[in-house]
């Protein structure tokens, strides 16, 4: 009974983020922050720009997006749902992924702080841990041998991820979930 629109924008640009929410209008009741730059790199070989960019995309962009979503939800006085896409990196460090691990962990902490700060305003903030490779074009085109080795059962289905987001969106305020993990039955965790 509603409509949704996926928008690609520079999450690290404050003006672009404000324009995004201005364009969304007063009927906004769901906003999903889904960015990431899961690129490996050894910390001692990493330049500062690489590390800072991971933080800008994952955490700073999440701050800008979350702030504008909550401002809009509060201004319309009907609340809303703000969801952040996390990863297993949100919960634990992994060798050769220090930039990504730390920035996704920071995003999770930001989401948790926002959940506690704005629940009283009717804003449901959630964090979805996507734990494993996603069965989408990015992995199928970029790493075809890896995708073939995993098989469809070894990658998280996009429909399954969407189901998780919809589950959180539909929750009543008397039973809000903050964090939901999505993974295949084959994922070792």
Region locations from a protein language model:
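The beta1-alpha1 cofactor-binding region of Rossmann-like NAD(H)/NADP(H)-dependent oxidoreductases
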Residues: 8-19, 48
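A short, exposed helix-loop element centered on a Lys and neighboring polar residues
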Residues: 66-67, 112
């Amino acid at each position: 009974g509603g409509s949704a629109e996926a928008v690609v924008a520079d999450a690290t640009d404050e003006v672009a983020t404000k324009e995004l929410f201005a364009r969304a209008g007063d009927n906004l009741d769901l906003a999903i922050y889904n960015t990431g730059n899961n690129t490996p790199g050894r910390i001692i070989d990493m330049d500062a720009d690489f590390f800072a960019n991971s933080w800008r995309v994952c955490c700073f962009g999440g701050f800008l997006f979350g702030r504008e979503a909550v401002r809009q939800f509060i201004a319309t006085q009907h609340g809303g749902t703000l969801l952040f896409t996390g990863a297993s990196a949100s919960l634990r460090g992994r060798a050769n992924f220090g930039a990504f691990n730390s920035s996704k962990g920071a995003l999770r902490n930001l989401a948790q702080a926002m959940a506690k700060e704005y629940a009283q305003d009717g804003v449901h903030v959630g964090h979805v841990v996507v734990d494993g490779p996603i069965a989408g074009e990015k992995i199928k085109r970029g790493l075809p041998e890896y995708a073939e080795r995993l098989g469809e059962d070894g990658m998280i289905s996009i429909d399954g991820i969407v189901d998780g987001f919809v589950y959180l969106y539909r929750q009543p305020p008397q039973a809000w979930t903050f964090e939901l993990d999505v993974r295949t039955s084959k994922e070792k965790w």
